[in-house]
Design a protein with these regions (language model features):
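Conserved MFS/SLC helix-loop-helix module at the cytosolic interface between two early adjacent transmembrane helices
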Residues: 57-95, 266
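C-terminal transmembrane helical hairpin of 12-TM major facilitator-type secondary transporters
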Residues: 249-255, 260-261, 266-319
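Interfacial helix-cap and linker-helix signal at transmembrane-aqueous boundaries
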Residues: 33-34, 65-66, 150-159, 235-236, ...
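Hydrophobic core of transmembrane alpha-helices in multi-pass small-molecule transporters
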Residues: 97-112, 297-310
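Helix-loop-helix hairpin linking two adjacent transmembrane segments in secondary transporters
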Residues: 137-183
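Extracytoplasmic gate region of multi-pass secondary transporters
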Residues: 26-31, 208-264
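Flexible cytoplasmic inter-helical loops of multi-pass small-molecule transporters
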Residues: 183-199, 388-397
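Intracellular juxtamembrane helix-capping segments at the cytosolic ends
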Residues: 112-125, 311-324
Length: 400
């Protein structure tokens, strides 16, 4: 019975994430804002960058809130915020209006939803199945991008205002009933780590393994959101391909697939090794991308990048749970998610380099160097052993 309830929660979480995952198609919306309203590339990209910052910042608050109030209330609140943000953006179609409403308010709503459904689903499963369960839940966002890319392209064809309106109604109608199915298991949650962490938020920030995870999440998600933001333009510049939404959909499809694959692989070979493998795949794909000159070639490389990028959203929450326990998982994962907000700097730098150089090769080289650095860092990552020195303090050292 518990397994059935667990998968029901996981699938409901997948549905919520599917609806929340509209930002993965932002590059198409940005093109519409530029072509229809005359926004500059920086203006069109800025709401997404602000979304990343607000999303990651509010993940901390949402995670702590759901740890205490439960995931159902927080997810429902998130759905209402998402719908309101999209609907209101249709009536305030200025760079400042969309940035404030879609960037900040939508980011808060997304944090409430994503920060609640993943922890809730994970608590229903044993350690051996947490990677797979996490992969199933976060796959919703990847599938969303695959479906939303052509849908948003179609809606933007009728005007960005109409696109915001229709998407807003979708969110209001869709998230609320699914949120009613999101709940924690009764009684004690399944154990995750050998010695669960009870450190407070400022203590967790001093743990070496957490700092390493934050840096790795920063670089790798920053790499991914660079493609989410600029892929439509990259297709036109490097492959003379005007139907960039097809590459966006390809990236999204493999993004979704990567989440399931990463869950299965990490359950089998371990979290740290799976991370090293994922980062290495990203590095190799970026090296090949330097030579991209045709839609087919670029499509293959983008698919591999999407596969690796999707894996991040399975590997990192599963690793946080395995390393630090689930008692305060929402808070800990929220703190890690601030790295995604910092990763919003990467697409801004890529846009700046594109404006100076006329292509994205300089940005690709920057990402290659950064990914090589986190591969080395991942080789040093080991599961911590945690011992309580007192009620207030925890001492962490690496397993010998």
């Amino acid at each position: 019975m518990k397994v059935y309830e667990g998968w029901k929660v996981a699938l409901a979480g997948t549905g919520v994430n599917f609806l929340v995952g509209i930002p993965y198609a932002w590059s198409i919306m940005a093109t519409g804002l530029s072509q229809q309203l005359g926004w500059s590339p920086v203006q069109a990209a800025f709401p997404y960058t602000v979304f990343l910052f607000s999303y990651s910042f509010f993940m901390v608050l949402a995670g702590k809130w759901q740890d205490h109030a439960g995931p159902r209330l927080v997810t429902t609140t998130g759905g209402l915020l998402l719908g309101a943000a999209s609907l209101l953006s249709a009536f305030f179609l200025s760079p400042a209006g969309v940035t404030l409403l879609w960037g900040v308010l939508y980011g808060f709503g997304a944090a409430c939803c994503f920060g609640s459904v993943t922890p809730a689903a994970m608590k229903w499963f044993s350690q051996e199945k947490k990677g797979l369960a996490t992969g199933v839940v976060v796959t919703g966002m990847g599938v969303s991008a695959f479906v939303m890319a052509p849908l948003v392209y179609y809606l933007v064809g009728y005007g960005v205002r109409n696109a915001f309106l229709i998407l807003g109604f979708m969110l209001l109608v869709g998230v609320t009933p699914l949120a009613s199915l999101i709940k924690n298991p009764p009684g004690q949650a399944t154990p995750l780590a050998d010695s669960p962490v009870t450190a407070r938020w400022y203590q967790i920030l001093r743990i070496p393994q957490f700092i390493m995870l934050w840096l790795m999440f920063w670089v790798t998600t920053g790499t991914g959101v660079t493609f989410v933001t600029h892929l439509d333009t990259m297709a036109r510049v490097h492959a003379a391909f005007e139907r960039g939404f097809i590459l966006v959909a390809l990236f999204a499809f493999f993004n979704a697939s990567g989440r399931i694959v990463a869950g299965l692989v990490s359950d089998r070979i371990g979290r740290s090794r799976a991370m090293t493998l994922d980062f290495s795949v990203t590095l190799v794909a970026l090296l090949f991308l330097l030579q991209a000159n045709s839609p087919l070639y670029m499509g293959v490389v983008v698919s591999v990048l999407g596969l690796a990028y999707g894996g991040l959203y399975t590997l990192f929450p599963a690793t946080i749970a395995t390393f630090f326990g689930e008692k305060n998982f929402g808070l800990y994962y929220g703190l890690l998610y601030t790295a995604l907000g910092a990763g919003g700097l990467f697409p801004l730098i890529a846009g700046y380099l594109y404006g100076r150089q006329g292509d994205f090769k300089g940005a690709f080289l920057l990402l290659i160097i950064a990914c090589a650095a986190v591969i080395l860092l991942s080789l040093l990552l080991k599961k911590p052993v945690i011992k309580e020195d007192s009620v207030e303090e925890a001492r962490i050292w690496e397993r010998s």
